[in-house]
Amino acid sequence: MRKTKIICTLGPATDRDGILEQCIESGMNVARLNFSHGSHEEQQKRIDKLYELRKKYQKPIAALLDTKGPEIRLGDFNDGKVNLKQGQKFSLVTNEVLGDETKAYVTYKQLPEDVEPGTRILMDDGLVEMIVEAVDETQIDCVVVGDCELKNHKGVNVPGLHLNMPYMSEKDKSDIIFGINNHVDFIAASFVRTVKDIEDIRAFLHENGGDGIHIIAKIENREGVENIDGIIAASDGIMVARGDMGVELPEEEVPILQKMIIGKVYEAGKQVITATQMLDSMMKNPRPTRAEVADVANAIYDGTSAIMLSGETAAGKYPVESVQTMVRIANRPEAGIDYEKRFYHRGRHEKPDVTEAVCHATCTTAYDLNASAIVAVTKSGRTARMISRYRPACPVLGGTTSKRVWRQMAMSWGVCPILLDEKTDVFALFDHAVDKGKCSGLLKSGDLAVITSGVPIGISGTTNMLKVVNVE
């Protein structure tokens, strides 16, 4: 069983007949809906198709809504894109106009107030660079550095600039309510800078009936990196969003920051996603570069919970092949990792709570007895996530009666989510979970399984029980 989870971004490429279904068959665990692009109508069609296929395959494919966030983007171009030459003049304007070879609309109205002659402005994840020459109230005149192509809605970055805008825009609020109404499982919060950004989203979710939705904080700028410990504590998981991070910060810092952030989130027992340009060449080519293969493998060696495909599946020529390639790459390093050695080298927390202590003991018991699987029966998913935190070698069956938790566990490293029927007796629930494990093919008669849960059942945060069973 593959332990690292795969997130696929939906878009025009997966809208084609049969493509999303093939991605699911190939190993997709989570569907990402990028609300920086596409209308609610377009996203609704994707969600409806996803939910139809989820029901058909009875698979817990989670839905992740990625917000636009407090970012700056270009508007539309007359022909969808323009080609620019080194040294030519180009203007960014705050009046909403169709772009051409001389100008483009920029969504941040206050940008002229925040830049000055000599300021570097980067676009499209740093592929396009311009230098500011002159500024007035509504227009920034620039000179283009290097031949380049600009397309609709590409991101705009000014390294080191603090955006003087509220964290949650009206668009983000509208998108999040759309997600609540469509029962998404995760919100990926773009450009998180401080703990307050997470608190604002959580309060908004609470006010609008979205309490069960988990928040993944995207770390994309220096402020987010500087506040990483608090952001990890406040959120349910972290996305290492390397595209904007590599523009906002020196690119040579990105690998170091990636390892640091993955390590911190891993230690906190939360989910961590490594994202952006993982198989970027497969946008146009059927095979990845060797450097991309090494990049994906190194993220897995670092301990990432999930690896994400962005443009590769949303708009690339080879979306299905990209998923299949991710699966093959993930399987190889996983097969070579000594998880038991890592577990004992890692040790345990000095002051664990009851759940952490029981989960650590569960993993120790599984290693000592060479168990075939760990069965974590959980109300909120926390028990399964705590087991996942210790990266056990054997599969983790995350059993829950909640459909949302069932789907959310699809992002947890090493966890195979199983949906359980409601039971009033704890031992009947354990037997039911083991039977489901047999149906999944991860358990068979004669296997040894270690079960952990909480008594009384059905109450979140009460993990206090460990049981070893011989599967009949």
Segments (PLM) and residue ranges:
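Non-catalytic helical/linker scaffolds that mediate oligomerization, partner binding
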Residues: M1-E472
